Amino acid sequence: MSKLIIGIDISMNDFYACIKVRTEDNSIKIKGTRSFENTDQGFENFLSWSLKQKKDDEWSVRFVMEATGVYYENLAYYLHSQNQKVSVVLANKIKNYIKSLNVKTKTDKVDAKTIASFGIERELENWEPMSPMYKTLRDL
């Protein structure tokens, strides 16, 4: 089965996404990169664009992002509500992964590509939203 990973580097106003695919012959290809607004409309456009990259229903799709402050939360909740597989990774894990690759350039686009590579190489756990009670307590 082919594996489609969407790496996401998110900030307050926008986010970059990079789609990488690992095919059955184990080759890895970049399918595309694009930026979107960090808004409800941006989320819809992003999901539509992402799912168009699937060749068939046999492909496994996973969205991978860093836990950066609270900026990732709205997108993670949106994707989860759309029954998508989401993985949220601690920022220090991504930082150490970038160091291991000896990546010198630091841009949102490069970070999205690196996050996608991280997701391609690993079996990541599904993110689950916190319960409404905990979310309310945290937001106090």
What are the residue ranges of the model-derived segments?
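Phosphate- and other anionic-substrate recognition elements at nucleic-acid/protein interfaces
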Residues: 1-140
